[in-house]
Structure formats: structure tokens, C-alpha cells
Design a protein with these regions (language model features):
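Carbohydrate-interacting/catalytic domains
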Residues: 2, 7, 11-18, 22-209
């Protein structure tokens, strides 16, 4: 539920519609009294107390729904920002795209997690701002939200101003990271000091000899 909501919200080019009670996963539908249900009032209600009960899990979905809307609503005219697809791997069931400075990453695989998954992304620093795996949302806390990720230089993609962003993607999780663009001149200096994976491997081979 969390992943589908986020992928829907993050790809909108207009408003985001949610039905009352659906923000926390209300278990019942709404059905007003009519001839077809014998004029019953049984489902003509919303159990608003469910989201406030600590012994149930509705609170987690409600908290996530509120958090993801808050992130997107902080971006002015978010719906007008272009969607830049960075990764779409059907085999791994991984999807990643950028909207302005927000990077959305999804691992829809039901049981396969990826450690150090490489995504070609604009050069810079990325920091976590939301994770569906956060314990506050009923997750396991497998993603370290304090870690800031720096892209890794690759000469093959230097002309496109893209580098490798390595992330841990637990199964069935979604995360949002904020992209911090390099300061003017910072990219050039960083590129000089960084070594590609290939050059590092070659150096290691020469040392062994």
C-alpha cells in the first residue's frame, strides 16, 4: 500500500485524490442506506478511531500517507516538474526517477534485496528524507537514514554529468532522497581527484605483480 501510494503521488501532474478513511487503510467501504442493502446503516460510517489505536497497524499507513504528502507539498509546483527516468529494470523490479531535486527509488521485488545497487544519477550528494521501511511507518529500519551518499565517478558517463549512486534497496521498499547539486567548480575538482572503478582495479593488479 505504501509503495503504490508513493509511486502514484510522485508521478502526478495534477492533484492527488484520496477517499475519506483511505489514508490509513479503512477496512470497510461506505454504503449508504438504499433498497439494495435493505436500507442498512451498517456501512454508512467511518471508524476514525482505528488510526489512533496503538494496538493496530492503521497508524503506520496513516503516518506514511501524511509524511509523503508533506514532502511533495513542500515543493512548489511539483506537478509541473519533469519526470527524469534514471532506472527501469523489469528483471530486478527496480524503478528510479528524479523530479527537481527529489529522487524516488522503488524496489518492488517481493523477496530480493540489493546491496550497493548502482543507479546512474546526476553528480552530487544524496541524503535520505523518507523511507517506507522506517519503523515509524511499520518498517524494519533496514535503511540508514543518516548516511549521505556521494556519487562515484565513471569516465564513460562524464560527458552526461552522471555518476554511479550506490544504494541499499531492501525488498518491497521505497525511498526518497534529496539531491544536492555540486557547487560551481566542485564537480571539476572532484572529477580530478576521483578514480574510476576500472583504474582502481588496474592499480590493484599492478601492485600484486
Amino acid at each position: 500500500h505504501k509503495m503504490i501510494r508513493l509511486v502514484t503521488l510522485s508521478t502526478i501532474n495534477g492533484g492527488y485524490l484520496n477517499f475519506m478513511g483511505n489514508e490509513f487503510g479503512h477496512p470497510e467501504w461506505i454504503d449508504f442506506p438504499r433498497q439494495g442493502n435493505g436500507w442498512s446503516y451498517k456501512y454508512a460510517r467511518r471508524q476514525w478511531d482505528l488510526v489512533d489505536r496503538n494496538d493496530l497497524k492503521y497508524q503506520y499507513l496513516g503516518a506514511f500517507d501524511e509524511a509523503m504528502i508533506h514532502v511533495v507539498s513542500q515543493k512548489k509546483k511539483f506537478e509541473r516538474t519533469p519526470i527524469v527516468k534514471l532506472c527501469e529494470n523489469d528483471g530486478d523490479q527496480v524503478l528510479a526517477f528524479l523530479r527537481d531535486d527529489l529522487l524516488f527509488v522503488f524496489n518492488f521485488h517481493p523477496f530480493k534485496s540489493f546491496n550497493g545497487y548502482g543507479i546512474l544519477a546526476p553528480t552530487g550528494e544524496y541524503e535520505h528524507i523518507l523511507s517506507s521501511d522506517d519503523p515509524a511507518f511499520g518498517g524494519y529500519g533496514l535503511i540508514d537514514m543518516k548516511v549521505k551518499h556521494l556519487t562515484r565517478h565513471d569516465p564513460l558517463f562524464e560527458k552526461d554529468n552522471k555518476e554511479w549512486l550506490m544504494l541499499y534497496l531492501p525488498a518491497r521498499t521505497a525511498q526518497i532522497l534529496r539531491w544536492k547539486k555540486p557547487e560551481p567548480g566542485e564537480t571539476k575538482n572532484a572529477s580530478k581527484s576521483k578514480k574510476s572503478a576500472g583504474s582502481i582495479k588496474n592499480e590493484n593488479k599492478s601492485k600484486k605483480k
